[in-house]
Structure formats: structure tokens, C-alpha cells
Amino acid sequence: MNYLIMFSLALLLVIGVESGRDGYIVDSKNCVYHCYPPCDGLCKKNGAKSGSCGFLVPSGLACWCNDLPENVPIKDPSDDCHKR
């Protein structure tokens, strides 16, 4: 019985853990950040574990972030960059 309670509690804790997501970080206009300044610093400043430079068609070199929080926007492939 005690094992069942401990297992249930552990399962609840694991399910409640918020995980991040990977993707190309974007600004409010769905435009990617290009690889300067270095991506690792930009991604970490926004709560990611790490970042690197990747190639995104048709944007070119863009910052890819690993394990970004849910509140940080990532590239929506169905939407274009709205610079204007």
C-alpha cells in the first residue's frame, strides 16, 4: 500500500514538470534572429539551456534554441516574417 502511494506521488510530480521546446527563436513579428550576436547567449538570456546557429530556408542562418520556455515565441512555419 505504501509503495502505491509513493508511486502515485512520484507520478504526479513527473507529470507536473514543465518541459521546454526547441526551435528558432523569433521576435514579435515572427522574424528569426540571425546568428549575430552569438546564439548561445541570446537563447540563454531567454531561458533556454543552449543555442546554436542553424540554417532555415528561406531565412538563412538563424538562432536555434534548445529547451526554450513556453512563453518565448518560436518560428511559426505557416506565418511569414512581418517586417513592415
From Swiss-Prot:
Family classification: Belongs to the long (4 C-C) scorpion toxin superfamily. Sodium channel inhibitor family. Alpha subfamily.
Job of this protein: Alpha toxins bind voltage-independently at site-3 of sodium channels (Nav) and inhibit the inactivation of the activated channels, thereby blocking neuronal transmission. This toxin seems to specifically act on Nav1.6/SCN8A sodium channel. In vitro, it inhibits the proliferation of the prostate cancer cell line DU145 (IC(50)=15 uM). It shows low effect on the adhesion of DU145 cells to fibronectin (at 15 uM) and is inactive on DU145 cells migration.
Domain named LCN-type CS-alpha/beta: residues: 21-82
GO biological process: defense response
Provenance organism: Androctonus australis
Coarse class of the protein's main subcellular location: secreted
Protein's name according to its UniProt entry: Toxin Aah4
Tissue-level expression: Expressed by the venom gland.
Molecular function via GO: sodium channel inhibitor activity; toxin activity
Disulfide bonds: 31-81, 35-53, 39-63, 43-65
Keywords for this protein: Disulfide bond, Ion channel impairing toxin, Neurotoxin, Secreted, Signal, Toxin, Voltage-gated sodium channel impairing toxin
Lineage of the organism: Eukaryota, Metazoa, Ecdysozoa, Arthropoda, Chelicerata
PROSITE patterns per record: LCN_CSAB
